[in-house]
Regions:
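Beta-strand C-termini and the immediately following turn/loop, strongest in propeller blades
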Residues: 49-55, 93-106, 136-142, 146-152, ...
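Repeated scaffold domains used in trafficking and secretory/extracellular systems
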Residues: 34-38, 79-85, 125-126, 131-137, ...
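Blade-loop segments of beta-propeller domains
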Residues: 30-37, 57-98
Length: 288
């Protein structure tokens, strides 16, 4: 699929702050970027990946930054919207759709099946499915793509080496939630556990996972929405509603970054600034 659509972006000013805002889509449907852990842009910022349900089902669209043109590139029945992860070199978008692991070429719209549930089951040694609405992870160098598979009692992290096209089951646990490769080395893969035992990092060299942060159970501490801070080997942790913490994945050293009710917090590429929305109350997006 490679269907060009007319540009529909517009500029306007925020009535309260006066900031100029660039609205990328105006179609009366749900249009959104990938989950906050995944980059929406390629590194060269030639296009932004948008999930749109303007056809009645979620599909992948590229918005060209040069002229605002939209290009639909997916042709599955429906894209699993939160699995979408663009590659940084701008060549591919990786995602699930129709119970398949896929990647689509951004230049041609040609899609390639990377894994089926039957192939995943052979890797896991039991019947599994690809859970809906769950994020995937692509390493910073675009080499490794990590996905999740689920059986009746276990969760698995499966990793594709995109150079050799070989899959490997690298981790299994009672639950595997969000995953993200460390931007400084693909050897570390953050694998969130359940909300009650959240922060785990898989050392892919040894196959061993370590809990790098222990929540305060007595005070019902809520840790969520973890993400790497580039250049630091640290994970930022939303300690909702009390602020943001950072923990070093090797030393376990903890520091506090912020003390407001951040919800989704993500760092810039340099690891020097973060942006975060806020939750209960919603007081807008903050930079820190």
């Amino acid at each position: 699929m490679y269907q060009r659509l007319p540009a529909e972006d517009r500029w306007f000013s925020d009535p309260q702050t006066g900031q100029r805002i660039h609205q990328l889509t105006t179609h009366p449907s749900i249009n959104h970027h990938p989950f906050f852990l995944s980059p929406a842009w390629d590194d060269a910022m030639r296009h932004i990946v948008i999930v749109s349900d303007r056809t009645g089902k979620n599909q992948l669209n590229l918005l060209q930054t040069a002229d605002g043109t939209l290009i639909r590139i997916s042709d599955v029945e429906e894209v699993d919207e939160w699995t979408v992860h663009p590659s940084r070199d701008g060549r591919y978008v990786y995602y699930h759709g129709d119970a398949l692991g896929l990647r689509t070429d951004c230049a041609t719209g040609q899609s390639e099946i990377l894994i089926t549930e039957e192939e995943a089951a052979r890797l896991c040694g039991e019947s599994v499915t690809f859970p809906l609405g769950k994020t995937t992870a692509l390493s910073h160098d675009d080499r490794f793509w990590a996905i999740r598979a689920r059986s009746a009692s276990r969760w698995y992290a499966l990793v594709l080496d995109t150079q050799t096209q070989k899959w490997k089951m690298e981790y299994e646990a009672e639950e595997v939630s969000h995953m993200q490769f460390c931007p400084d080395t693909p050897d570390y893969l953050f694998c969130a556990g359940p909300l009650t035992d959240r922060v785990w990092v898989l050392d892919r060299r040894t196959g061993q996972a370590r809990r790098v942060f222990q929540r305060d159970v007595a005070h019902k501490q809520w840790i969520t929405h973890e993400t790497w801070i580039p250049g630091t080997l640290e994970l930022s942790l939303v300690d909702w509603p009390h602020g943001i913490l950072a923990v070093h994945c090797e030393t376990g050293k903890i520091r506090r970054i912020a003390d407001f009710n951040a919800w989704h917090a993500i760092s810039n590429e340099q690891g020097t600034m973060m942006a975060a929305d806020t939750n209960f109350p919603d007081v807008g997006i903050r930079l820190l």
